[in-house]
Amino acid sequence: MNNEIAEQIKGMLVERLRIPADELEYDSELFGEDIGLDSIDSIEIIVGIENLFGVDLSGAAREDFRSIETLTAYVEAHKEG
């Protein structure tokens, strides 16, 4: 896992969704009991990642949004350059 990308994603989640940084681990379930985000929050995540990394998330599966780790893996696999 690319820690730089993971930290950028974590920072974006903290900023956009106002999640306390100390509650957000790389493997925290974003849409489960850990953090409890909803479908509106997923839109914020999509916009944030697309703007931050220039990655198109339209082909992403639900599993790609499970945690910072899975989001990082998706960005690594689809980022140009």
Could you describe each region identified by the protein language model?
Residues N2-G36, I45-V47, N51-G81:
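Phosphopantetheine-dependent thiolation modules in NRPS/PKS and related acyl-activating systems
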